[in-house]
């Protein structure tokens, strides 16, 4: 069966992806059936300091990691952060 894909663009897309993962959890969706999630955002930054609020991407990453814990690598869905501009070449893959 083909793996589904969820593309989360910007902060609103990340909020929607978090809501989807919560709904999938509440509805009992097996973690192997979660879609691959691609986050496209030019503004994602690592926040520093004690007063820094967690970013949406950080929250999404934590939730996703918890949900797919224990899933074999061959069946594990992907979470990938993509920067849309050529000067931001690096991206993160989980």
What are these regions (language model features)?
Residues 1-94:
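Segments that form or flank anion-binding pockets
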